[in-house]
């Protein structure tokens, strides 16, 4: 017993000494310099390099009674006090203890360098386990693994209780995942902003400017606005009047059958200028028309000349115009299906256009009629109409041979007569037709050596026949030697001989 007391007194004395020593050292600790940052040890510290086995070892100090292990000897001595076993604590010597630092045994690690050594044994052990050891502990909620048990316990307490929300709306339960995602999200947003800035510099109008037409026209205005009908040009020469002349109708027929009229802005511009359209028609047929002739002929209300050019009973093929404008140049309702044309040459009017997209096709040749049929038709038309309509009913169309060309001479302009070869008088109103009916026309005069009366050739020897007027005309149609019908010699004299 006295030994135990001595031991106890000794221990208590040591404890008291140590306690008094601690009390004496406490004022001195106030004047110590601040701790260095981790990895920046004191240059005078002792550098200790431990083996990986020593760093990974746990419970180096084991209790012989309960076999409980401890990492430090002091912890084991304190544990022994619980078993009423003798225990001994190391006394702090009065000498200044040299500070110890620990380096990582892995050569490639940052903390392998003595200048980056760690000043705590526990710190170097945890570092080695975290960076170079095996991760043994796994979280049941997020399946994250840990090499240090204390880290795993700390994570298990807060796992699932705190959420990290990114600006894009994504939720994260782990802070490290949130940090990684946020870095990627910020980089993506910065790249998008950069591309937008570049596109704005390259195409400023596309990005900033709106279409003024769209702004001016609202959807309601677009829906309420009625669809405009396709614009079709009105009548060619003059606006329709109650007493319309035959010449105006003939000009309409010529323009509709010769010109490829389309529903275009050009036709709309020329709808108030008949001279332009007639000039185009004359160029297509081969006539020479001047503006003065057009103005004079336009004021002429007697339609005899134009009536001889085109028959009022022409077939619908003569009125073939663009189907894009059906209301343009509409034919009369009293038209008959067949024409009294003496010409079989389809190249006089040129190809017509029925539909703008289709190709041009020539008109089919009209069947020839005998002289008897022509006379009967002339008698019928003469009984129902005036002189102008009689000649217009004949439907005599001029055609010449390939060797004969139309003259461009001013004295024999073919535009006012439209194929008759009658001289143009600037101030006259139908005088040419009157002279023809009375027999005083220069057509039958001695100066006219050759008469090309719409395809009815006349020999030089017959130029002296000046009497008769209309009877001479019918006589020249019906018989007599030296008449070359159509001027091309396609039919013999037997076909046109008078039947008595």
UniProtKB/Swiss-Prot annotation:
Binding-site positions, Zn(2+) 2: 166, 168, 181, 185
Principal location class: nucleus
Zinc finger residue ranges, CCHC-type: 164-187
Annotated Low complexity bias: 8-21
Secreted keyword on record: no
Quaternary assembly: Interacts with the DELLA proteins (e.g. GAI/RGA2, RGA, RGL1, RGL2 and RGLG3), acting as coactivators.
A cellular component term, taken from the record's GO annotations: nucleus
GN (gene name): ENY
GO molecular function, one term: DNA-binding transcription factor activity
Region (Disordered): 1-42, 196-236
Location of Phosphoserine modifications: 51
Keywords from the named record: DNA-binding, Gibberellin signaling pathway, Metal-binding, Nucleus, Phosphoprotein, Repeat, Transcription, Transcription regulation, Zinc, Zinc-finger
An individual GO BP term: regulation of seed germination
Zinc finger (C2H2-type): 61-83, 102-132, 137-160
Protein's recorded name: Zinc finger protein ENHYDROUS
SMART domains documented for this protein: ZnF_C2H2
One Pfam family of this chain: C2CH-4th_BIRD-IDD
InterPro entries in the cross-refs: C2CH-3rd_BIRD-IDD (IPR055187), C2CH-4th_BIRD-IDD (IPR055185), C2H2-2nd_BIRD-IDD (IPR055186), IDD1-16 (IPR031140), Znf_C2H2_sf (IPR036236), Znf_C2H2_type (IPR013087)
Short sequence motif Nuclear localization signal: positions: 124-131
Region (SHR-binding): 174-186
Gene3D superfamilies: Classic Zinc Finger (3.30.160.60)
Subcellular localization(s) per the UniProt record: Nucleus
Disruption phenotype: Plants lacking both ENY/IDD1 and IDD2/GAF1 have a decreased responsiveness to gibberellic acid (GA).
